[in-house]
Amino acid sequence: MCKKTHRIIDFRPQANWYWLFDHNRAILTLNMGDRVIDIVYKPEMLILKFDQPVFFTIEDVANYMDLFEGPALGDYWPALRSQIILHALVANQFHKPIMPKNWLFESSVGEQPRVHKGDHIILKSSAIKEAKKYFVLDNDENFILCMLIEKSHGLTFNRNFVQFQIVKVTYDKIFATKADCNTLSQYV
């Protein structure tokens, strides 16, 4: 009879965590000592100027811990919270700038809400009217940079965003903010 052992995974950043581009699989990874996390962003979307490991910096740790322990992601399981944060760090450090993709999303009617970094929003695809939850990574007067939190978002009949993919849109594309995100059904 096999005895199962349950190990608690510690999601706090460690000194031995490092980013490494896996050339065999053409993917950026984060080595966390006992496990490796794959980052979903395609290599052509990343600014990768290293062939050696890039260790977590003090700033990485501070940003990670602020999000991990803060209220913005508190409703998510630690494993998903960690994945969201790691992809946010990559988007901030290694992702090339992107242009807005407003045509993919339906415009909302009514007052345009102001959102801030760390807020949750709903975007609705213009072609198939599918509404999904996104996490705001950055914003300015005109645009919001956000990351898909859900598993996928159908944009057209043959195009999907995958979980953690980022997109830039204007404020008029927001269908709901954090307070409304628990009631997705009303936006579908």
Curated annotation (Swiss-Prot):
Main subcellular location: cytoplasm
GO biological process, one term: division septum assembly
Its biological purpose: Contributes to the efficiency of the cell division process by stabilizing the polymeric form of the cell division protein FtsZ. Acts by promoting interactions between FtsZ protofilaments and suppressing the GTPase activity of FtsZ.
InterPro entries cross-referenced by the UniProt entry: ZapC, ZapC_C, ZapC_N
Superkingdom as given in the UniProt entry: Bacteria
GO cellular component labels: cytoplasm
Protein name, entry field: Cell division protein ZapC
Protein's cellular compartments: Cytoplasm
Pfam families per the UniProt record, alphabetical: ZapC_C (PF07126), ZapC_N (PF21083)
Entry keyword set: Cell cycle, Cell division, Cytoplasm, Septation
Native organism: Psychromonas ingrahamii (strain DSM 17664 / CCUG 51855 / 37)
Coiled-coil residue spans: none
HAMAP family cross-referenced by the UniProt entry: ZapC (MF_00906)
Subunit comment: Interacts directly with FtsZ.
Family stated for the protein in its record: Belongs to the ZapC family.
